[in-house]
């Protein structure tokens, strides 16, 4: 791993992608914590996927968290993970970052970067000073079933999204400008009117530049300029 990432809490990772013969429009589904009150959404996804390889077989939709057979769901997930690995449907992008462009159904494009998060640098406790903090409340009763899915899982399918405070646009925007010259790793429509997704593998030089940009955002000077408010407290006037 590029040593420049060692103190950032976000790193390049070994990223598994389906091989070219997999139908990506059936492979990709939304995160497990979406549409929790709409089981009919997940029923439609089930019909769309059918017997095709899909991440639907590798996640526990949280619409099913209270199902009486949730332990069977979890066992099936772990079995599907092992099956996909044994069948060799994945290729591995070693020590990589992927720049993505997500075209929404309303025409807006969201830009991002896929890598690995160091959970030792994360804390969801309100008021935490950790490098990576929660932006919303954590639903604690959803943690145990998520932990059970991961306990015997041979692969990991995280869906965490991090926000960066980058007013000078040093991290993502240089990749956007270079996207047409980068190696494309996927480009397809998402199911259920989910829009379109494109992914591009970063070069070694681009990974190095991302590390430098992120490091610049975490310097003491940068943190103070953005977040430190100096409060002057006067001594009380004595009579």
Residues covered by each model-derived region:
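Residue-level detector of conserved catalytic or cofactor/ligand-binding positions
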Residues: 231-239
């Amino acid at each position: 791993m590029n040593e420049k990432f060692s103190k950032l809490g976000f790193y390049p990772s070994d990223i598994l992608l389906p091989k070219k013969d997999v139908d990506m429009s059936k492979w990709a589904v939304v995160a497990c914590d979406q549409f929790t009150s709409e089981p009919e959404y997940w029923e439609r996804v089930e019909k769309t996927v059918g017997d095709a390889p899909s991440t639907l077989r590798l996640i526990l939709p949280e619409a099913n968290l209270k199902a009486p057979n949730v332990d069977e769901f979890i066992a099936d997930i772990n079995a599907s993970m092992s099956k996909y690995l044994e069948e060799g449907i994945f290729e591995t992008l070693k020590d990589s970052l992927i720049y993505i462009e997500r075209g929404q159904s309303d025409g807006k494009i969201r830009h991002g970067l896929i890598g690995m998060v160091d959970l030792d640098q994360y804390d969801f406790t309100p008021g935490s000073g950790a490098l990576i903090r929660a932006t919303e409340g954590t639903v604690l009763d959803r943690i145990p079933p998520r932990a059970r899915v991961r306990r015997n899982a041979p692969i990991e399918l995280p869906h965490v999204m991090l926000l960066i405070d980058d007013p000078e646009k040093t991290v993502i925007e240089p990749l956007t400008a270079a996207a047409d010259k980068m190696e494309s790793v996927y480009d397809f429509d998402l199911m259920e009117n989910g829009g379109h997704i494109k992914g591009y593998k970063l070069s070694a030089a681009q990974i190095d530049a991302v590390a430098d940009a992120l490091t610049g955002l975490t310097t003491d000077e940068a943190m103070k300029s953005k977040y430190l408010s100096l409060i002057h407290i006067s001594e009380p006037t004595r009579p």
